[in-house]
Amino acid sequence: MAARPLSRMLRRLLRSSARSCSSGAPVTQPCPGESARAASEEVSRRRQFLREHAAPFSAFLTDSFGRQHSYLRISLTEKCNLRCQYCMPEEGVPLTPKANLLTTEEILTLARLFVKEGIDKIRLTGGEPLIRPDVVDIVAQLQRLEGLRTIGVTTNGINLARLLPQLQKAGLSAINISLDTLVPAKFEFIVRRKGFHKVMEGIHKAIELGYNPVKVNCVVMRGLNEDELLDFAALTEGLPLDVRFIEYMPFDGNKWNFKKMVSYKEMLDTVRQQWPELEKVPEEESSTAKAFKIPGFQGQISFITSMSEHFCGTCNRLRITADGNLKVCLFGNSEVSLRDHLRAGASEQELLRIIGAAVGRKKRQHAGMFSISQMKNRPMILIELFLMFPNSPPANPSIFSWDPLHVQGLRPRMSFSSQVATLWKGCRVPQTPPLAQQRLGSGSFQRHYTSRADSDANSKCLSPGSWASAAPSGPQLTSEQLTHVDSEGRAAMVDVGRKPDTERVAVASAVVLLGPVAFKLVQQNQLKKGDALVVAQLAGVQAAKVTSQLIPLCHHVALSHIQVQLELDSTRHAVKIQASCRARGPTGVEMEALTSAAVAALTLYDMCKAVSRDIVLEEIKLISKTGGQRGDFHRA
């Protein structure tokens, strides 16, 4: 790293005009042509010198796949003056206490450290960064950092027209403005606030002050604003805009589902039908956008394809959240608290080692669209506050002690039981459990970091819950006659038309013995096929819904709730699966629960079979069943 200060010193020397002291020699004024030629040659010599003496890129900001991270996004605040539907819940989000947020000095200290290591672009984000009172001062301080080429801001535009002259004077060089509709009434519906005309005023102020291009970010959502694609594209005819159409992405609290997403190819086809002459524009290195231009238009359009065609291979971005956590991937849920280490007095080298370790753990690419949609992540406004809440509270809270701040195991990933809440009808989202209310107080999240080993280090709980109670309940009525066979021994479907509707609940389980090699790959999420646990969990949910199509004499049941939980057992190198189903009707749901557990187990086998064929599926069994004429059943 010693080479870097030397290189920067050489750059400073070469930037300065050549000066010399004369002891009486006459001064010769070159002609204009010679001056221009000499200046051009001098620039060429400087560039050649810098190429030959360039400092190596920081090892701390280079991941294991050789990606050099030169772009840092810093969240200045969690607060926002809008409530965009795709970004945060309508009621807002619990905010981190002010004492736990980065101070201005801490922001600048971290920025200075990252720039020293090779970051040359910083973008200020939020929340809404322009509601932070000292945002102009922060930009001015960043502008003084040698080596920082670009200071950008992503804003909703509400305060932009008022602040932009000051921000430009302070050193702001790039602007992204979020705008998802050109219809004022629809704007108010999407963001749940007024302000459309303020945003448009901000866009025109940016153009007036000479920003080119002014980037406009538009999240495209089916049934909401996909019909405005052509209107947005038409804006680029007379304005120096880069309208960036962003695929709708899943973040906690935005009720994401696949049906809302409009893919890049679909958007591109729509624009091409109107402007067949649309041309592809060469992309900059590490660009996230696929850029196109309509001949004769002043601006251009771009597509950010986070969901359908990821750009992980060229990712050069790191993020620091408002509470000081380093996040190496937008779609990841792991983070490192730089704030805590900074306040504990960590030296610059210690901070660099922490940063380097986090960057080194960055994966080759994020999970696919299907897996991302299930991941527990911060609401977009926070990026990301990670607490695992169950999908529904237990009928008997005393069955287990549930602590939302205690994360078990070695691979903190997500609350599997809550992932399907946005995809499958009937899943219930609970109120905050009493214990969480006690821990969190009124309106603020607390986070718990610990390096201690879990009291049960052999298990990894992916979703809070307990395995079925062993106590029998109710009379055990049995039949000595098979209900699906008639008097002549032929298959027959039971007539349930006259049976009363009652609440039916069934829980089934299965165990998959993976072996040490496959188990390790599943635990570390390193299978080439993807996240085996997520795929198996969703397969179990889907299987429960189609049980009547798989089991010939099984009735179709309108399930009101499906929950699939997976737990890693390192002592047996196994995955334990528990599936529960609920419905109100004339027939039970034990077949749905059993099918769910079995198919989840089969899916795990399929995901891991390339690694080992010595995988055993066992203990597929009914754990409990309630409701119905024959009484309740709980396996002893």
From Swiss-Prot:
The modification Phosphoserine is found at S64. The active site is at D606 (for molybdenum cofactor biosynthesis protein c activity). GTP binds at R73, R123, T154, K215, R317, L318, R319. Residues 64-277 form the Radical SAM core domain. Changing C329S: Impairs precursor Z synthesis. Residues 1-383 are annotated as: Molybdenum cofactor biosynthesis protein A. One of its GO terms (cellular component) is mitochondrion. [4Fe-4S] cluster 1 binds at C80, C84, C87. [4Fe-4S] cluster 2 binds at C312, C315, C329. Transmembrane segments: none annotated. Binds 2 [4Fe-4S] clusters. Binds 1 [4Fe-4S] cluster coordinated with 3 cysteines and an exchangeable S-adenosyl-L-methionine and 1 [4Fe-4S] cluster coordinated with 3 cysteines and the GTP-derived substrate. One of its GO terms (biological process) is Mo-molybdopterin cofactor biosynthetic process. Its cofactor is [4Fe-4S] cluster. Residues 414-636 are annotated as: Molybdenum cofactor biosynthesis protein C. Changing C315S: Impairs precursor Z synthesis. It catalyses: GTP + AH2 + S-adenosyl-L-methionine = (8S)-3',8-cyclo-7,8-dihydroguanosine 5'-triphosphate + 5'-deoxyadenosine + L-methionine + A + H(+); (8S)-3',8-cyclo-7,8-dihydroguanosine 5'-triphosphate = cyclic pyranopterin phosphate + diphosphate. This is Molybdenum cofactor biosynthesis protein 1. It comes from Homo sapiens (Human). The lineage of its organism: Eukaryota, Metazoa, Chordata, Craniata, Vertebrata. The gene is MOCS1.
